[in-house]
Amino acid sequence: MVTTATKKTQTSTSTRNKRRPARSGAELTKEQNAESGFTASAELSENLQKVLVDLIELASQGKQAHWNVVGKNFRDTHRQLDEIIEAAREFSDTVAERMRALHALPDGRSDTVAETTTLPEFPQGEIDTAEVVDLVTERLEATIGTCRDVHDAVDEEDPTSADILHAILEKLEQFAWMVSAENRVPAT
């Protein structure tokens, strides 16, 4: 037997648990997100985008170096480049997915990357390992510089995204040290 109190409870529960129909499209994202979570500001989106394009370009230029490196320590340099490329790809995916979690739109298209990266153009043709070491170190340091340039603004708005930058910085700085050590001479 269903009493009036039971009916009220059932009605109240079914009203509370009623889900909204699924929506899609950019116009509704801000409305939905305003109801349920954090939306990245334009500045946060732009800062994460800067890191994203440099990571994508780092992976691309790393592959160019990987294919065209020749000379002493070829095998070690070739393998080390694979490690850098893999890390840059994983980090770019992490940054892009973080942007989506914040309802920002990552843009990894080749024309966007080419137009906005801070990395200098990579030379064509075969390149000696010693030169590759210098070129890759320069690109690692440029990407590190981008992460450091945007860090404080990112941290102020979204500490979680700043934590991602910390992980990127730690690994890229380690790579820069290890790669650059190939061409260093001991201090006398």
Where are the regions a protein language model picked out?
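A structural signal for well-ordered alpha-helices, especially hydrophobic packing surfaces
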Residues: 52, 59, 66, 85, ...
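Acidic/histidine-rich alpha-helical segments that form the ligand environment
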Residues: 111-167
